Regions:
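C-terminal accessory segments enriched in acidic
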Residues: 42, 71-79, 85, 90-278
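Active-site/substrate-binding loop(s) of hydrolase catalytic cores
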Residues: 1-105, 124
Length: 278
């Protein structure tokens, strides 16, 4: 684990408030200095860069969460494809084929914008084939149990018959056919909600998103209102048709961004932490 202090505090940043995944080239932090030393000593044939991914990501063209996303990171600003990057692509294609048997259309391809301070981009620039794994959301699996299973399947399939890592003509095409992952999900969307805005009744949609909060060494999911209206391009992992019922929260009849998603509809139907409970 590169960032034990950050893992303990449930944050990307280390004890010096530095995001280590933006420190690969500069190596200003002791953790990154140590990783660089280990890299030089070990001289790996491949690097696997494992991350979690937020629930907001889905696969482009499909109304499905991006449960696992991959990337063969770029080695230059033009995002060209060289032999090093193609070796990573061969492995990604192998993992994608394995996962399609379990979670079809829920495998995404991460954005390949180049930043040499990102760990994967740095190692690719150093001519080591590198694969980024992003473990995302599976339907109603907020504890990521299913996601971990599919990461394991990915890792196992990448290691089987790895001696056959031969680059054939259609490898790049197959890689680029993996749908781009994009920001298209909220944890909750509430549709057809009546509000009163400046004494005018309106029907709107609004969304809530979980904040992951560390309390007493436990992670708690706290739903907060995150977007009001303009949700045509988004889907919810959970969606409610509120059938023109009136929103109310402590006497206020309009949802406010940043407030906890605890409210009533028609003063009768209760939502607590985003979820309908009555």
């Amino acid at each position: 684990m590169l960032n034990p202090d950050g893992a303990l505090a449930y944050t990307r940043e280390n004890a010096n408030s530095v995001d280590l995944n933006r420190d690969a080239y500069l190596a200003s932090q002791p953790e990154m200095k140590l990783l660089r030393i280990l890299y030089e000593e070990f001289k790996p044939d491949y690097c696997y860069n494992l991350h979690d991914q937020r629930t907001i990501f889905g696969t482009e063209g499909f109304n499905l969460p991006a449960t696992i996303s991959f990337l063969a990171p770029a080695f230059n600003n033009d995002r060209d494809y060289n032999e090093v990057r193609m070796k990573a692509i061969v492995i990604i294609n192998k993992m994608n084929r394995a996962l399609q048997e379990y979670i079809p259309y829920q495998i995404g391809r991460f954005d390949d914008s180049y930043n040499v301070n990102c760990t994967g981009d740095y190692f690719t620039t150093r001519n080591t084939p590198t694969i980024l794994f992003e473990a995302g959301h599976f339907q109603m699996d907020y504890d990521r149990d299913e996601s971990r299973k599919y990461v394991f399947i990915s890792l196992l399939s990448s290691l089987l018959d790895n001696y056959e890592n031969v680059i054939v003509d259609n490898e790049l095409d197959n890689y680029l056919r993996i749908p781009q992952n994009n920001k298209r999900f909220f944890d909750f969307i509430y549709k057809n909600v009546k509000i009163i805005d400046n004494s005018v009744e309106k029907i709107i949609n609004f969304a809530a998103q979980y904040d992951e909060v560390l309390e007493n060494n436990e992670i708690y999911f706290k739903a907060k209102i995150s977007k009001v209206s303009d949700l045509e391009e988004y889907s919810g992992h959970t969606e409610y048709d509120c059938e023109s019922m009136l929103f109310s929260e402590n006497g206020i009849n309009i949802p406010e961004i940043g407030k906890e998603a605890n409210f009533y509809l028609n003063n009768l139907t209760e939502f607590n932490n985003g979820v309908k409970i009555i």
